[in-house]
């Protein structure tokens, strides 16, 4: 297998800063961003890897081969290449990219396997659940509320029931916000707090910390042999291309309460159920 030594993987929940981080890194000349190869509907084979728990790929050869092609820059797909120069298929020309930045939003449960199997550094970016869920609920992508991929994995169902006393197959009576909270917990609490995935080339970083301190971004680049653009300071605060137009990041309006007390209570209940201490709970 070829060495993927020009690569970095960015994982995180949708609307948690993955696009902003990946785009900020990929602004550098000849850095190529591979955008969401795990998209279930915009790619032909993204369903092989979205919302899947894998410790390795011995029972998932199709997923392994798909990822191998992605990392080798051999998947010709407009969604994945949306941030690339696609004229004359330049995005597939070998030798041009100095770095590949691969951004995922549905592979948190297999990020460690990708790191081990392909030897690619991983940055798992997390954002507080309230802002993440509010942003997800604003864009209302149908797949965000669909927990069926998780529910079909009996080993994952058993793990969640054993560790948290919760049956993810029984969520029909849950509200949309509760389902988004369950997704956030599965994608972040399980790999970070339960499995405690870590390593010298596997980093967990908070979106809030990164946005507030440009020096943290520069340190991240140093640690992973990335080169920030010269005018980084002038673009660092810019929103990503995926920021919702009604977001206060764009409108610059004063931030208001995201949810009612009743809604906060339901989110807090799920967070408590999953024993999460990644962020403090909203006091009511």
What positions do the PLM features span?
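PAPS-dependent sulfotransferases, especially Golgi type II membrane carbohydrate sulfotransferases
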Residues: 1-9, 160-181, 185-204, 210-284
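PAPS-dependent sulfotransferase catalytic core
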Residues: 1-86, 138
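Hydrophobic/aromatic beta-strand patches that form the interior of the parallel beta-sheet core
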Residues: 8, 32, 121-124, 203-205
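Short His-Asn-centered micro-motif
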Residues: 11-13, 101-105, 126-127, 207-208
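PAPS/PAP-binding and catalytic site of the sulfotransferase fold
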Residues: 17-31, 114-117, 136-137, 204-229
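Glycine-rich phosphate-binding loop used to anchor ATP phosphates in small-molecule kinases
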Residues: 81-110
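Conserved phosphate-donor/acceptor-positioning beta-strand/loop module used by diverse small-molecule
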Residues: 103-104, 117-137
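Long, charge-dense
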Residues: 142-165
